[in-house]
Structure formats: C-alpha cells, structure tokens
Amino acid sequence: MNKIALYCRPGFEKECAAEITDKAGQKEIYGFARVKDNSGYVLFECYQYEDADRLIREIPFRELIFARQMLVVGELLRDLPPEDRISPIVGMLHGVIERAGELRVEVPDTNESKELLKFCRKFTVPLRNAMRQEKILLIRENVNRPVIHVFFIAPGCCYVGYSYSNNNSPFYMGIPRLKFPSDAPSRSTLKLEEAFHVFIPHDEWEERLASGLYAVDLGACPGGWTYQLVKRSMMVHAVDNGTMSKSLMDTGQVKHHKVDGFKFEPSAKNIYWLVCDMVEKPAKVTQLMVDWLVNGWCREAIFNLKLPMKKRYEEVAHNLQKMHLQLKEGGINAQIQAKHLYHDREEITVHVRRIWSAYAASRNDY
C-alpha cells in the first residue's frame, strides 16, 4: 500500500493536494497527488512503497487544514462481485494489518455518494464479522488500535486501508455529527461547537470551557457564536453594531457593545476566550488576533479566516506563518491549529492557545 487517501470538502481537492504535497516534501517524501474535482477526496501516491505508512505516522493529522481524514490505501478494488464482496476486501488486508480496533465503511461527502450510505451500513455487519474471524479485527472495539477503512467511491468500487487511532479523525467520514439547537439565533453556532470538538480534548472541557469564564465575541450579531458560550455558562461581551438575539440578552450573561469589532478594547484583564467570525480580509483578521494575544487580552482564541478565490492554501499558509512569527516576536509562546471544518464553507477556522509562563497562574488572572 503506497497511497494516502485524504477526505475533504468537495471543491477543495486542489487545496488538500497542495497541502499534503507540501507536508510530504518537508519530510523529504515524494510522490504525486491525484485530484478529481468535486470528488470529496484526494490520493497521494508515494514513489517509495513504505513512505505512505511513514507519512500517516509522522505528519500530525491535527496540522492538516483541508483534510478531514488521512489513511493508507491500496489499489482501487473495482467491480466487486455482488455474490461475494467481502473476500476481495479481506484479502487486501492479509499481511498488512491485524487486530485492528475498529471498522469504518465510508463514502465521500458528495450528493452522489449519499445513496451508497444505506448499503455501507448494511454491509458493515457481515464485513466486520468476517474480519473478526480472520483476526484482522478485534472482537471488541479498541480505541488504541488502528482503524480499518473501506472507502466506497462508487457501487462495487472501494479503497481499503487503515489509519492510526492516535493520528486520525475520531469521527465517521471525518465529520462530527452535531444537531442544530432550535433556540440558537443562527446556524453559524455549529461552526463554534464543531471547533470545540476538533480543537479541545474532551477531558479538558471542564477547565477550558468552564462556567464563569469571561469571553468576547467580535462580530457577534445575531449571536450564533455567543450562544455556544452562554450555553456553557460563560459571561460574554458581544461586540457588534447590529442587533443581538433577545433570548440571549435575557439570560443576563451577555453585555452588548455597539462598537466596531476592530476598535473594541476590553476594559479588564479577565478575558479567557476571544471568538470572532467577521467577513473581512484574512490578513486584517489575523493581525487583529495577533494584537489581542500580544496585548494579553485573552488566553485562547477561535476565529474564521475567509478564503480568497485562488491560491487558497498558499494564502492560509502565509497568514498562519505570519501569525506564528509575530507572536514569537511579541514574546508569546502559542499553539496554533487550523481546520476547514465541516460547517465551514469558503473559510477556515483557526484556534490559538497562548501558553503562559511555567508557574501556575490562578483562575483570577484570566
């Protein structure tokens, strides 16, 4: 197996391909990307057989922006016989992997592939049983073992491969399943909720998304992102010249500042979270976030960068590198992650966590 399959949002295959080619080159691993527009996935074929496995071990999945999932696959299995689709799939995995912890039978995130989902769900049970009999799959699911992926791109045609559970997306098809809350003021609320799931480990939610924390939402109206903060019992400064949702204002947890988000400055040093979803040039938003972090006005930030029509990966990489250098020059040690989330469209979501000095600070310092 010398190929890597990367799932992505349809229409962003070129960005996904540019990114994996760049990351592989940094590891001195070379190959070429196969791209089909609006397919929802990219294949990167390595020149050296063993390099595919090395790539999915050594490239941190959390550092990939446009990939929803990353796995090693073999050659495309075509025209699987309807009377026995299982044997060719199991045969692909003999000698490649054993005692895997989970099986996922998946499809690309396209309208055409959605018709295959019903088949995938039915097919998973007999395929799982066959893999367990062959000792390719453990009897019980184990989150610490590799994941087997069977990726159907058309009826009777699939890629078979695996990912490592410590360096992949834990979500089926790489997509968190979130339900839109009926009382939220806009669907944009799902972007921030997904960002929390993707960027913050669940065992740290009680500390980093705790009730009583103070937050600022720049470009808040009507309150989709503020809703997520209020739901977690935070106190929120909502900054926008527009109108906020009455139900959010009625909670008593929101203070509305009718000010331009680029001009607002907090009056106190107790802000933990800064969130921002404003329609503005990426460079301008990036600079605003740098200013907040260097000034010590927040501890963590989640914000969106709107994407240009062309050279989207290059523009994103440039802005993130610029942010990294400016924070470093400002004496700030920070963790930066970016992802093209499922609920993002022509934008990416960035998370920055400022790392404070080595001594333990009290909660009141935030």
Curated annotation (Swiss-Prot):
It is found in: Cytoplasm. One of its GO terms (cellular component) is cytoplasm. S-adenosyl-L-methionine binds at S188, C221, P222, G223, G224, D240, D260, D277. The active site is at K306. The keyword S-adenosyl-L-methionine applies. Signal peptide: none annotated. Belongs to the class I-like SAM-binding methyltransferase superfamily. RNA methyltransferase RlmE family. RlmM subfamily. Catalyzes the 2'-O-methylation at nucleotide C2498 in 23S rRNA. This is Ribosomal RNA large subunit methyltransferase M. It comes from Photorhabdus laumondii subsp. laumondii (strain DSM 15139 / CIP 105565 / TT01) (Photorhabdus luminescens subsp. laumondii). The gene is rlmM.
